Swiss-Prot record:
Organism: Halobacterium salinarum (strain ATCC 700922 / JCM 11081 / NRC-1) (Halobacterium halobium)
InterPro entries the record matches: Asp/Glu-ADT_sf_sub_c, GatC
Domain of life: Archaea
Key words, A-Z: ATP-binding, Ligase, Nucleotide-binding, Protein biosynthesis
Protein's name according to its UniProt entry: Glutamyl-tRNA(Gln) amidotransferase subunit C
Length: 91
């Protein structure tokens, strides 16, 4: 089987996630991803069965309810700005 996920892709994803992986970790992740994809390929071999769904979504009507006003919602916020929650900068 050819590698469905290669080491370069794993390094790229790790870089995006700001994870440091050494060569051994990358090889391990490549092997694990290959194993996972093989299991999904096996699922394609399972025959489909015509069956009625056992679960049904239960929908309820939307109901208007009282909510917090802006001052109450911001009352416990550690920091606010211009009537909104303020969080730390993310770079």
């Amino acid at each position: 089987m050819t590698d469905a996920v290669d080491a370069e892709e794993i390094r790229h994803v790790a870089d995006l996630a700001r994870l440091r992986l050494d060569d051994e970790d990358v090889d391990t992740v490549v092997d694990h991803c290959g194993d996972i994809l093989e299991h999904f390929e096996r699922l394609e071999e399972v025959p489909e069965v015509d069956a009625e769904p056992e679960l049904v979504n239960v929908m309820r009507a939307d109901e208007i309810a009282d909510s917090l006003d802006q001052d109450d919602a911001l009352a416990n916020a550690p920091e606010t700005e211009d009537g909104r929650f303020k969080g730390p900068n993310v770079s």
